[in-house]
């Protein structure tokens, strides 16, 4: 589901208990910054809230502050709510230059190490899309002063990424034994990698509501 308002000013709130009302969401977020509007979808048949909302603030700074303060810190009916930046329907974002899409999209990012010189991006797609849909083109780069060929591969689904790791890690590909694991997070604390419980929960919700299409 895509939200047509200014994406830079809007946050996605997930893992909401259906007992939470729109008024309660408003009262919660108004404590952080002024709220312009809230979109809180209901199931058309059951008329029950679907567990997620879009909250639009008056400016991008207010939205970013809400993410910083509210994400994974507030518990409603024993559920930690998840707050992330909204992306628009064209796949672009209105984000500050120091924040990349990989930091806010709940996708499965893998780190591939020790690739053979003959392996290019198209070959990586052929190798990895056997396990599941790739959300974007692989990125190839070099470490160790250009001696170690590596890549990032982006899966839409963590379960498919798990399968790729299980099947390909420490296997020979074009006569090179490669390492396949989740990548380190750009904005993570310490050595945090993609694939933790929060990532997987957000990924399932995003897939359920077609937010990665």
Swiss-Prot record:
Key word Amino-acid biosynthesis present: no
Biological process according to GO: mRNA splicing, via spliceosome; U2-type prespliceosome assembly
Domain RRM: 9-88, 108-185
Residue runs in coiled coils: none
Subcellular location: Nucleus
Keywords per UniProt: mRNA processing, Nucleus, Repeat, RNA-binding
A Gene Ontology cellular-component term: U2-type spliceosomal complex
Pfam families: RRM_1
MF annotations from Gene Ontology: RNA binding
Top-level lineage group: Eukaryota
Principal location class: nucleus
Oligomeric form and interacting partners: Interacts with RDS3.
Remarks, miscellaneous: Present with 1240 molecules/cell in log phase SD medium.
Function according to Swiss-Prot or TrEMBL: Possible SF3b-like factor.
Protein name: Protein HSH49
Gene name for this UniProt entry: HSH49
């Amino acid at each position: 589901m895509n939200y047509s308002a200014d994406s830079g000013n809007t946050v996605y709130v997930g893992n909401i208990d259906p007992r939470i009302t729109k008024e309660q969401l408003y009262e919660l977020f108004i404590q952080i910054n002024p709220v312009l509007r809230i979109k809180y979808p209901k199931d058309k048949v059951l008329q029950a809230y679907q567990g997620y909302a879009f909250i639009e603030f008056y400016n991008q700074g207010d939205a970013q502050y809400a993410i910083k303060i509210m994400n994974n810190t507030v518990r409603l009916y024993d559920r930690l709510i998840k707050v992330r930046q909204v992306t628009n329907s064209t796949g672009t974002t209105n984000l500050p230059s120091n924040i990349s899409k990989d930091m806010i999209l709940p996708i499965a990012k893998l780190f591939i190490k020790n690739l053979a010189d003959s392996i290019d991006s198209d070959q990586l797609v052929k190798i990895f899309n056997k396990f599941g849909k790739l959300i974007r083109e692989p990125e190839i780069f070099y470490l160790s002063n250009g001696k170690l060929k590596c890549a990032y591969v982006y899966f839409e689904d963590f379960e498919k990424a798990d399968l790729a790791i299980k099947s390909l890690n420490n296997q020979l590909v074009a006569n090179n034994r490669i390492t396949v694991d989740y990548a380190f997070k750009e904005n993570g604390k310490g050595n945090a990698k993609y694939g933790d419980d929060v990532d997987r929960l957000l990924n399932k919700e995003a897939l359920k509501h077609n937010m990665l299409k």
